[in-house]
Amino acid sequence: MTEIYVDADACPVKDEAVKVAERHGLTVHIVSNSGMRPTGHPLVKQVVVPAGPDVADDWIAERAGPQDIVITGDIPLAARALEKGAAALGHDGRPFTQDSIGMALAMRDLMRELRETGQSKGGGPAFSKEDRSRFLRSLEDTVQAIRRRPPP
C-alpha cells in the first residue's frame, strides 16, 4: 500500500499532501525534529525524531519503499528515496528522477560552495501559488501513476 512521507521541517505543502492522501485513503507520515500541532486526522501519523543532522531524513529513508512517495526539499534525501525505488517530489511539485537527481546534487553542491565563498547570497524565489498548484497536480499524478503500476 502506498504511503506518503513528508520531510516536514520547513515544508510549505503539508496540508496539500494530507488533502491528496485523504482523497486516496493513504497514510501520511509527517516527520519533523520539532513539535507539531496535532492534526487528529486518522490518516496522519506525526513523527517527532530527535534533533540532529539528517535524523528525520534517516527515519524516512529507512522506511520508504517502491510504492511510496517522499516529499522533501532535501536533495540528498530525494536521492536516497529514489535508490529505494520510491517516488520523490520537491515542495514545488517538481519530481526528482533518476535522470535529474545527479544534476540536482551537483547544483546543490555548487550553490553551497558559492555561498561559502560569498559569491552568492541566499536562496531562490519565494514559494508561490503556482508552486502550490504544481505540487497538488504533481502529487495527484504521482499517486495515480503508482496505483497503475504492478506491485513489486
UniProtKB/Swiss-Prot annotation:
Q: Where in this protein does the record put region Disordered? A: 114-152
What the entry lists under InterPro entries is as follows:
UPF0178 (IPR003791)
Basic and acidic residues bias spans:
128-140
Q: Name one Pfam family in it.
A: DUF188
What is the name listed in the Swiss-Prot or TrEMBL entry for this protein? UPF0178 protein Plav_1521
Q: Out of the domains of life, which is the source?
A: Bacteria
* Native source species: Parvibaculum lavamentivorans (strain DS-1 / DSM 13023 / NCIMB 13966)
Write out the similarity annotation. Belongs to the UPF0178 family.
Q: What is the lineage of its organism?
A: Bacteria, Pseudomonadati, Pseudomonadota, Alphaproteobacteria, Hyphomicrobiales
